[in-house]
Structure formats: structure tokens, C-alpha cells
From Swiss-Prot:
Organism: Pogonomyrmex rugosus
GO molecular function: sodium channel regulator activity; toxin activity
Keyword tags: Amidation, Ion channel impairing toxin, Neurotoxin, Secreted, Signal, Toxin, Voltage-gated sodium channel impairing toxin
Keyword Signal: yes
Domain of life: Eukaryota
Family: Belongs to the formicidae venom clade 1 family.
Record flagged with keyword Secreted: yes
Protein name as it appears in the record: Myrmicitoxin(1)-Pr3b
């Protein structure tokens, strides 16, 4: 069975977007910088760190939704 080219490209794109998200420095803010900035900055950094993986997941699912008709017809 031959793997469709668009499916292969989609899997690679999702893999790359996931690795880029976890490599982002905002996901793990430095403790020293957070302590100097205060509790407000700590709350913002924590919220951003928690939201980024979800945003990456949502963005990775958008191409799959647009490919759904092509998968069903092919």
C-alpha cells in the first residue's frame, strides 16, 4: 500500500511543530528572571507555558480538517 504524499507531509509538519513548541524558552522560564520580575510576570509566564502546547495541538489539527474531504474521496 502506497502512502499518499499529503499524509506523509502532514505527519512531518506535525512532528516539527511539536518539537518547536517544546524547544521554546517560554515553556520553561528561568527561576532567577521570574523572581526578579515579580509575581505578575510569574503568572503570565506560567499561563503562556501552559497554553503553548494546546495552541500547537490545535494548529496541527487544522490541516487535518482541510484534508478530510480528500481522504474520504481517495
Amino acid at each position: 500500500m502506497e502512502i499518499p504524499k499529503f499524509l506523509f507531509i502532514t505527519v512531518i509538519a506535525i512532528g516539527l511543530s511539536g518539537s518547536l513548541t517544546w524547544a521554546n524558552p517560554l515553556a520553561n522560564p528561568e527561576a532567577e528572571a521570574t523572581a526578579e520580575a515579580g509575581p505578575e510576570a510569574e503568572a503570565v509566564a506560567e499561563a503562556v507555558g501552559e497554553a503553548e502546547p494546546a495552541v500547537s495541538l490545535i494548529l496541527s489539527l487544522i490541516p487535518l480538517a482541510s484534508l478530510s474531504p480528500a481522504i474520504k474521496s481517495g
